[in-house]
A protein has these predicted regions:
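Extracellular/periplasmic carbohydrate-active domains that bind, remodel
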Residues: 1-177
Length: 177
């Protein structure tokens, strides 16, 4: 935790197969008691945060401005996401999954998303305060997303999920897939 910027300029927005080229700003797997607080993240590759199998994850007051996924919460338990701004014009801002990423089925459960702002403004424009809508549409699907979504790649379930007091702007809202 603590103020600072993670600048992922060298990350790719695609799945990386090149040596030394990454596609995630932060990746957590099979962790417990993790807190991410008071950080800014810019141009974060394919995932700003990929959390898989994390128990007791707190994400508080993060500002993310990227062109792909903001937070991917997969097979996690006891997660609190609060007071975050996630701008992700070409993909999902916050996505909850229950995939087979751990090599076993595991639900995503006990998740609270509150007091967050998700959007689909041009990448980088929320971080610099200009809030622009000049970029052409996303090259792979033709529309802005920036939403909160449940279900991508999921084979497990979801239990005890609460989304409260969140603002959705220039995005596709809440999606169930």
């Amino acid at each position: 935790s603590g103020p600072g910027l993670i600048y992922g300029k060298g990350l790719t927005r695609e799945e990386s197969r090149l040596p030394g080229v990454g596609n995630k700003a932060i990746s957590l797997k099979d962790c417990r008691n993790v807190t991410l607080k008071d950080l800014s993240m810019l141009h974060c590759g394919h995932f700003a945060l990929l959390a898989t199998g994390v128990d007791h994850l707190t994400i508080l007051n993060l500002k993310v401005d990227t062109n792909r996924d903001g937070f991917d919460i997969d097979c996690c338990r006891n997660v609190r996401i609060s007071q975050c701004t996630v701008n992700s014009p070409w993909d999902d801002a916050i996505v909850l999954k229950a995939s087979y990423g751990l090599g076993r089925f595991q639900d995503t459960e006990n998740v609270t998303i509150s007091d967050c702002y998700v959007s689909g403004f041009d990448k980088g424009s929320v971080m610099d305060g200009t809030w622009q809508l000049d970029e052409p549409q996303a090259p792979d699907h033709g529309f802005r997303t920036g939403r909160i979504k449940f279900g991508t790649e999921s084979s497990g379930g979801f239990r005890n999920i609460a989304i409260t007091n969140c603002i959705f702007e220039h995005c596709r809202g809440l999606a169930l897939e």
